[in-house]
């Protein structure tokens, strides 16, 4: 097997590494840089990637694409994509399937197609170093990437001519790079990963047992639309606002000027990590009837911090959730590792140190650690590294919609992957010949508040009373975090399978808010559960009573039948509403009205027993009375 390279496909910068002996090595690209800007430019007949693309952006803003990772696996209608449309100089358009695509040189392109250009450059960089063709790669994604985004990343690899052997989470990769050369005792580390477009936190336990290192992810959380680009945008908006106050001109209508301001803001942000003040000086940034206009704005570190403080504080909320999910306190964290270029900002470092009560380690390169860890995992898959075991987790729960609009979870968040889970469900109506399996991802009890990943039908179910058919639903989550679902009718053996497609992925806003929403809406979820239970009990009561009316036949007096049917009608009128008390009250009224049915059923049963007592029971030597105990799989 050839070398399996490790690629960190970043929002702002990308990086490639290979295993050189036992040590991961970051490779320099054709321009001599260890990281490559994730910028792609389309010029007349040529596609530029990295620094060459960045250099010509000012004169070609509409055809220079950047931060494409923020669009990968996402829908055009998503609120965050709509916000990006307002600030991006290039066109974001709606694809036929509803995905967010981009347009350059009059051509519409999918996000994986554009990201593939960066992956091609990474592939070429590795091939130049190794002197041989490279086809296998481990590509990293934010830990909080959903099914659709992971699928889209694999698609980008395939378009770039790479066989993506494994998708791994960025914080986990960083932990691999950090822990590989540390053969000491067991440690629990927190990886805080604030990159160009995404934020992740992972709590990882590193164990050393008989010379083998186990990296086990205990919990992960994050925000897929929080990163350095958002910090840049705050500074860009400030500079544009200051210029408008001074000159009365809004630069947002001038793509060329905005590209220059973007570059200047990024440069100023970096400078303010080491300096207390910087000047943003852009001569001839625009012009009007009175002549050329120049931008000259002083920006202090304190000003930048005031502009972005809420973004930094927003990153602390997922830390609390991850620690709670791992059932750990901050005191139990051995080391804190910072990953991603935005963690170079002193304010970020200070807030993280304050949260954990300890300084982060300085021996991890925030730009290179992720690619190095991916190269280590490539070595594990190729068989070159034998004493490392990686146990990653799924960031969000998977389940299906069941009766009453409830999400029934089959795989809980923070479950180690790969994993498989199955559960048996049944029909909700008599003689139901088909069921719809609606697959969901998220943490809320109410199905509509989770994201629909897709649905499919299982048809050809044999007619039977409701609750009788046995439909086995199986969720198979692979090591890349990508889901396969199957449903099987146990009676007929008919089966239907689905691999969740990229067009059904979660939106970034939904993903970042799901776990926090679940925490904040516990009371609402509890009330909803109680309402659904009341509705289901009402349904069962109506169904059972109607069946008893049929069985009673002429034995049920007409006036009693009329009374019961009126109670059924009254219950049917309220059971679809949201008033639990009204549903409970009408259910009780139906139970009272149906007393006569119970008496008739008892009389029939007694009469039957009397008839049976007159007959001699048939002996059956093969029947043995036995007690049994149900043993559930752990």
UniProtKB/Swiss-Prot annotation:
<dbReference type="GO" id="GO:0140662">
    <property type="term" value="F:ATP-dependent protein folding chaperone"/>
</dbReference>
<keyword id="KW-0597">Phosphoprotein</keyword>
<protein>
    <recommendedName>
        <fullName>Chaperone protein DnaK 2</fullName>
    </recommendedName>
</protein>
<dbReference type="InterPro" id="IPR029048">
    <property type="entry name" value="HSP70_C_sf"/>
</dbReference>
<comment type="similarity">
    <text>Belongs to the heat shock protein 70 family.</text>
</comment>
<dbReference type="InterPro" id="IPR018181">
    <property type="entry name" value="Heat_shock_70_CS"/>
</dbReference>
<dbReference type="InterPro" id="IPR029047">
    <property type="entry name" value="HSP70_peptide-bd_sf"/>
</dbReference>
<dbReference type="GO" id="GO:0051082">
    <property type="term" value="F:unfolded protein binding"/>
</dbReference>
<keyword id="KW-0547">Nucleotide-binding</keyword>
<keyword id="KW-0346">Stress response</keyword>
<dbReference type="InterPro" id="IPR043129">
    <property type="entry name" value="ATPase_NBD"/>
</dbReference>
<feature type="compositionally biased region" description="Low complexity">
    <location>
        <begin position="602"/>
        <end position="613"/>
    </location>
</feature>
<dbReference type="GO" id="GO:0005524">
    <property type="term" value="F:ATP binding"/>
</dbReference>
<feature type="region of interest" description="Disordered">
    <location>
        <begin position="602"/>
        <end position="634"/>
    </location>
</feature>
<comment type="function">
    <text>Acts as a chaperone.</text>
</comment>
<feature type="modified residue" description="Phosphothreonine; by autocatalysis">
    <location>
        <position position="198"/>
    </location>
</feature>
<dbReference type="Pfam" id="PF00012">
    <property type="entry name" value="HSP70"/>
</dbReference>
<dbReference type="InterPro" id="IPR012725">
    <property type="entry name" value="Chaperone_DnaK"/>
</dbReference>
<keyword id="KW-0067">ATP-binding</keyword>
<keyword id="KW-0143">Chaperone</keyword>
<dbReference type="InterPro" id="IPR013126">
    <property type="entry name" value="Hsp_70_fam"/>
</dbReference>
């Amino acid at each position: 097997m050839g070398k399996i390279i490790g690629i960190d496909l970043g929002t702002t910068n990308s990086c490639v590494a290979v295993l050189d002996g036992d040590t991961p090595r970051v490779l320099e690209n054709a321009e001599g840089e260890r990281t490559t800007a994730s910028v792609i430019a389309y010029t007349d007949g040529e596609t530029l990637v990295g620094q060459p693309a960045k250099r010509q952006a000012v004169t070609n803003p509409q055809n220079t694409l950047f931060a494409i990772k923020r669009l990968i696996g996402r829908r055009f209608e998503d609120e965050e994509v709509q916000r990006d449309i307002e600030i991006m100089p290039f066109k974001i358009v709606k694809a036929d399937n509803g995905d967010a695509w981009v347009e350059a040189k009059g051509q519409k392109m999918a996000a994986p197609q554009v990201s593939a250009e960066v992956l091609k450059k990474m592939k070429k960089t590795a091939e130049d170093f190794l002197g041989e063709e490279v086809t296998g790669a481990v590509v990293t994604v934010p830990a909080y990437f959903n099914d659709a985004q992971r699928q889209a990343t694999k698609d980008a690899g395939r378009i770039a001519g790479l066989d993506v052997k494994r998708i791994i989470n960025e914080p986990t990769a960083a932990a691999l790079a950090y822990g590989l050369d540390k053969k000491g005792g067991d440690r629990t580390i927190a990886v805080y990963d604030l990159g160009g477009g995404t934020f992740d936190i992972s709590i990882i336990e590193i164990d050393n047992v008989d010379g083998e290192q186990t990296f086990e992810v205990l919990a992960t959380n994050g925000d897929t639309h929080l990163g350095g680009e958002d910090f840049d945008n705050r500074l860009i908006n400030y500079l544009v606002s200051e210029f408008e106050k001074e000159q009365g001109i809004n630069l947002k209508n001038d793509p060329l000027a905005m590209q220059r301001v973007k570059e200047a803001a990024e440069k100023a942000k970096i400078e303010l990590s080491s300096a207390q003040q910087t000047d943003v000086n852009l001569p001839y940034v625009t012009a009007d009837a009175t002549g050329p206009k120049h931008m000259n704005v002083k920006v202090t570190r304190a000003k930048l911090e005031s502009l972005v403080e809420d973004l930094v504080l927003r990153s602390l909320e997922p830390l609390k959730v991850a620690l709670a999910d791992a059932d750990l306190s901050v005191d139990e964290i051995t080391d804190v590792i910072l990953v991603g270029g935005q963690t170079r900002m002193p304010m970020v470092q200070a807030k993280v140190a304050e949260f954990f009560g300890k300084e982060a380690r300085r021996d991890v390169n925030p730009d290179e650690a992720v690619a190095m860890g991916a190269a280590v995992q490539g070595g594990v898959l190729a068989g070159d590294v034998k004493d490392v075991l990686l146990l990653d987790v799924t960031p969000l729960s998977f389940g299906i919609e069941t009766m009453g609009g409830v999400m029934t979870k089959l795989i809980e968040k923070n479950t180690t992957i790969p994993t498989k889970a199955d559960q048996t469900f049944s029909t909700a109506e008599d003689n139901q010949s088909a069921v719809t399996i609606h697959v969901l991802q998220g943490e809320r009890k109410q199905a509509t508040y989770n994201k629909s990943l897709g649905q499919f039908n299982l048809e050809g179910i044999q007619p039977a009373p409701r609750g009788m058919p046995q439909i086995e639903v199986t969720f198979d989550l692979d090591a890349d975090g990508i889901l396969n679902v199957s449903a099987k009718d146990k009676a007929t053996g008919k089966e239907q399978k689905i691999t969740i497609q990229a067009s059904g992925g979660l939106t970034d806003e939904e993903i970042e808010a799901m776990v926090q929403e679940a925490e904040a809406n516990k009371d609402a979820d509890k009330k909803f559960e109680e309402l659904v239970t009341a509705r289901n009990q009402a349904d069962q009561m109506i169904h059972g009573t109607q069946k008893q009316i049929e069985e009673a036949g002429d034995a049920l007096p007409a006036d009693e039948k009329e009374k019961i049917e009126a109670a059924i009608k009254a219950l049917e009128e309220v059971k679809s509403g949201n008033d639990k008390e009204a549903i409970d009250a009408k259910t009780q009224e139906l139970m009272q009205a149906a007393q006569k049915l119970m008496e008739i059923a008892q009389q029939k049963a007694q009469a039957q027993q009397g008839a049976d007592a007159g007959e001699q029971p048939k002996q059956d030597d093969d029947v043995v009375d036995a007690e049994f105990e149900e043993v559930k799989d752990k």
